[in-house]
Amino acid sequence: MAHFALLDENNKILTVIVVGNEYLLDKDGNESEAHGKSWCEKFWHRKTGDVGADWKQTSYNTSEGIYYNQVEQSDGTYKQVKSSDQSKSFRKNFAYINGIYDSKRDAFIPPQLFKGWVINETTCQWGPPTDDPSTSDALYTWSNVSEDWVEMEVDGVTVAEIPKPLD
């Protein structure tokens, strides 16, 4: 199955749909984003060039620029495992509603959840504006209230103050 995102005139993601692989095949039997886009335009009656309409293919298995395979576990659940074939990595991230498509980066960027967070240019994900200062002696977490890193506490005790187990 393939996934396509419908974008508005500002490249905001309006919806994401599933398209059968058979609708992506060209006359030689090769998958083609253009064929999938054409099918989306016909089925959804939203043509590229119409006001507020463009379709872009997105990869369900790509996150932070890394392509993952779904591997079934012995208990019947699935686990994402980094693929040895990273040529399948596509547009940095899966498209999420209210996220954006950045044509300069050819990447889908998820919605910004926290004020002040910045885009990581490698992963096209949002993150705190400064690096995590955690060390082996202290752990920090981002506070959206103070918009800064704060030392983590467990039951009112700063993590750095919690006794470490003896070797």
Regions found by a protein language model. Name each.
Residues 1-167:
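Viral virion structural and adsorption modules
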